[in-house]
UniProtKB/Swiss-Prot annotation:
Signal peptide: none annotated. It comes from Xanthobacter autotrophicus (strain ATCC BAA-1158 / Py2). Belongs to the universal ribosomal protein uL2 family. Part of the 50S ribosomal subunit. Forms a bridge to the 30S subunit in the 70S ribosome. One of its GO terms (biological process) is cytoplasmic translation. PANTHER family: LARGE RIBOSOMAL SUBUNIT PROTEIN UL2M (PTHR13691:SF5), RIBOSOMAL PROTEIN L2 (PTHR13691). This is Large ribosomal subunit protein uL2. Residues 222-277 are annotated as: Disordered.
Amino acid sequence: MALKHFKPVTPSLRQLVIVDRSGLYKGKPVKTLTEGKSSSGGRNNNGRITVRFRGGGHKQTYRLVDFKRTKRGVPAVVDRIEYDPNRSAFIALIKYEDGDLAYILAPQRLAVGDQVIAGEQVDVKPGNAGPLSSLPVGTIVHNVELKVGKGGQIARSAGTYAQIVGRDQGYVIVRLNSGEQRLVLGACYATVGAVSNPDHMNISLGKAGRNRWLGRKPHNRGVTMNPVDHPHGGGEGRTSGGRNPVTPWGFPTKGKKTRNNKATDKFIVSSRHKRKK
């Protein structure tokens, strides 16, 4: 879908660039495939802020998206493509031959009326899901599982995808958007195609209020705070912080490596950092 620009009648409309969603379904979601969603405002069960700069925003209904594609071997037809406020990608309502309905992530080039299926051997066309081992090398995929049966975890945001680049002793080598190459079990499922709404990266919200509609509050830098609020706070006039960048809790940030999962290091064939050198 194309980007939408506006006549510069106001300063915010001059800056505003959004995705044209005129081709999406305009009604309400299927009620049986939705759940209520309460807003936490960034607070935990003690009422304390655990995630800063969250709060407000429009009330949202959660759509139950099928990341597992559990109904195997049953063809389904795409009934409509919908907007989902909980994610950057669009979702597709599919209707199985036996009448069941489900939401899936809508890939690019998937249209209303297209047939999709999940199974052990499927055609390489957008929306079909199958084990990584059954898909040819070079295939563009999304919604990739890391554990068999857990559901897709990789490449679910708007415009993202992964590519199958090789095979190795029951594993498949997958190249991610970051440049990382990773071993994933061949039995893990993935869906063919790249995720819809690739223009999401080009939008401009135009005004602060649109950020508030999304539940995001103003983000304050540490150097603008008082010493009681942040290690960079205080000082007479404008100061640079006077130390290496740290988080509000004193831990190093801005370039400090935070990965701490040695158990899965063996599955990383090529680091995403190698591409930068």
